[in-house]
Design a protein with these regions (language model features):
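A glycine-rich, hydrophobic/aromatic-adjacent loop/helix-cap motif
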Residues: 466, 473-474, 480, 492, ...
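N-terminal export/assembly segments and adjacent metallocofactor-ligating motifs
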Residues: 1-443, 450-461, 468, 477-480, ...
């Protein structure tokens, strides 16, 4: 029975004191982790003598909406071990400087009687010494220095640069402000007060989804994770939610228990795939091909064979499908051109911002109308007309936009479309009408909807090089065509497209795509986004609870934006902030442009101004244009 004596004997239980002392705490502090994470989880930080001893998830989140599950539990493995980062022996908690630079600077400073600015100037004037510390880059050799030493060298180099080149040659970069608003603002304010330049960040490391400003004119406007529960069809595309959205993954699982179909598109069976009803292992970078085939099926079965009223109304009201595009002939080939402006027709002669207002046709009268949702109405003097109401912005008359000229057209023109995947071109029939411009010319125009039908290979009885069926591999964008790129069978595409569209029809748009930085980091990743968004728009999913395109990366938003930006950019001193787009700055100054050619080297696009200029030429042109 000696083991009983061991249990009750105080002498044999002293080891317990080690654990009691390890987990003792003086107080509990509520906090979160500023690690560029959108989780924003609330943590109970247990502190002893000013040192974090352990962390625990808070359990007091308010349940403000009983239609969705509670937000708890929130947290992740990274969060609960965050104190290990704080007290890690490899965490750098002090300034370090390359020994080669430190020795050279101190020697010059001593020779200059202690003047740091003169010392830096002499160091820069000596090419041999300058090259010595430059060649040391990438080879280690760091030494710990005092804060005063580091700050003195930074200040001296800044003053020298201002005196010799001007303050706008001092460039600063930091990751996204929401990661640490105070840290970012202090550095940015320092730069702005002396005329320096801040580089952009969100776009530089490819977190900003370019498709969003291209389509909607905003940066990243997505739903919060609780809205996943209201969806009835979720596609996780290039987003490993179990790893990158750990505090929110429970909404994904709970939505599935609530009857939501969950699909994961990923080359590998990732952490999130185990939460899904279906795993689609498309080849990396082929998501766009898959979605274009899905849209082909949606247009065929839900816009042509059967016109779903909700889809048709949404397409008219919330997309640019009714807008008119001029068709232009070049070397005997007809190509889609620019959208037609109201300034080009005499009916709207003298309209303010006419170059930024575009045309629809009223389905009832056949008259030209000017929709109010365009940029021209946003910036004109008369306010209150920048909306999506079906009223002519110039006359106020109600109208019903014409989506297609299929039943009422003046002509059918063979228009050339380019398919870059297989480097092919096709001539396809497009119904057109003729509009007489101010100068008396008759210009053929087509709706974006009709051009989209032709682009996606839907003939609707028109002549041209259209696919013969879903199984036609030689014509974009059939289910069989996408097999070449994705490795996914056409039957999977058909099932997916029909389930997506049927769910969107029944729920009026409660189908969503969750996407992460993986696809956004691909060359032309914006086109993969847009391929998916196309299917969403044509089934009325964007702007709906439980629907739309939801791109999650870091913490791109901060609450006190207006007041914070005043401090950050030193607007309180009356200065105009100097800001520079990060990608272009690095593209030019790192000589990356030297490795690119003209756009026409990479695709079979027709010769035009865009294709015949280098990206660097366009960057220079943008600067010249202000």
């Amino acid at each position: 029975m000696s083991w009983i004596e061991d249990i009750i004997s105080p002498q044999t239980r002293k080891w317990e004191e080690f654990y009691r002392n390890r987990w003792q705490y003086d107080k509990i502090v509520r906090s979160t982790h500023g690690v560029n994470c959108t989780g924003g989880c609330s943590w109970a930080i247990h502190v002893k003598d000013g040192v974090v001893v352990w962390e625990m998830q808070q359990l007091d989140y308010p349940q403000f909406n009983k239609e969705v599950p509670p937000y708890e539990p929130r947290g992740c493995q990274r969060g609960i071990s965050y104190s290990w980062y704080l007290y890690s022996p490899i965490r750098v908690k002090y300034p370090i400087m390359r020994g080669a630079l430190l020795d050279l600077f101190n020697k010059e400073k001593q020779a200059c009687g202690g003047d740091p600015v003169e010392a830096w100037a002499k160091l820069q004037a000596d090419p041999v010494k300058r090259a010595r510390y430059q060649r040391a880059r990438g080879k280690g050799g760091f030494r710990r220095v005092k804060w005063d030493e580091a700050l003195e060298l930074i200040a001296a180099s800044n003053i020298y640069t201002i005196q010799k080149y001007g303050s706008d040659r001092i460039i600063g970069f930091a990751p996204i402000p929401a990661k640490s608003m105070l840290s970012y603002a202090s550095g940015a304010r320092y730069l702005q007060l002396m005329g320096g330049v801040n580089l952009s960040f969100y776009d530089w490391y490819c977190d900003l989804p370019n498709a969003f400003p291209e389509i909607w004119g905003e940066q990243t406007d997505v739903c919060e994770s609780a809205d996943w529960y209201k969806s009835k069809f979720i596609v996780s595309m290039g987003a490993n939610l179990g790893m990158t959205r750990t505090p929110d993954i429970h909404f994904f699982s709970e939505a599935r228990h609530n009857g939501t179909k969950t699909v994961v598109m990923s080359p590998d069976f990732s952490m999130v795939a185990k939460h899904a009803d279906q795993w689609i292992p498309a080849h990396a970078g082929s998501d766009g091909a898959f979605w274009m085939a899905v849209t082909h099926v949606i247009l065929k079965e839900y816009h042509i064979d059967r016109q779903v009223p909700y889809f048709m109304d949404y397409t008219k009201r919330f997309t640019d499908c009714p807008f008119l595009v001029k068709l232009e002939e070049k070397d005997g080939i007809v190509l889609p051109g620019r959208m037609m402006r109201i300034s080009e027709v005499s009916q709207f002669d003298g309209a303010e911002n006419g170059e930024w207002k575009f045309l629809n046709i009223d389905a009832k009268t056949g008259n030209l109308v000017s929709p109010m949702g365009t940029s021209g109405y946003r910036w004109q003097d008369e306010k209150g007309k920048w909306n999506l109401n079906f009223n002519d912005g110039e006359t106020g008359v109600e109208y019903d936009p014409e989506l297609t000229f299929l039943e009422k057209h003046d002509d059918v023109m063979q228009v050339e479309f380019v398919e870059y995947g297989l480097d092919k071109k096709a001539l396809r029939g497009v119904p057109v009408r003729y509009i007489t411009t101010k100068d008396g010319q008759k210009v053929p125009v087509a709706t974006i909807y009709d051009l989209t039908m032709a682009q996606y290979g839907l003939g609707r009885g028109l002549e041209g090089e259209y696919p013969t069926s879903y199984e036609d591999k030689n014509a974009a964008y059939t289910p069989a065509w996408q097999e070449i790129f994705t490795g996914i069978g056409s039957k999977t595409v058909l099932q997916f497209a029909r389930e997506w569209a049927s769910t969107a029809e029944t729920t009026e748009g409660a189908c969503m795509v969750i996407v992460g930085a993986a696809i956004n980091h691909w060359f032309h990743g914006n086109l993969m986004y847009r391929a998916s968004i196309m299917a969403q728009m044509l089934t009325g999913c964007n702007g709906k609870n439980g629907g739309g395109m939801n791109h999650y990366v870091g913490q791109e938003k901060l609450a006190p934006m207006d007041s914070w930006s005043t401090i950050m950019s030193s607007k309180d001193w009356g200065t105009a902030p100097r800001l520079q787009q990060g990608p272009i700055w690095h593209y030019i100054n790192s000589s990356q442009w030297r490795y690119d050619g003209n756009q026409k080297f990479y695709n079979s696009a027709p010769d035009n101004e865009l294709a015949n200029m280098h990206t660097a030429d366009w960057a220079v042109k943008a600067v010249r244009n202000g």
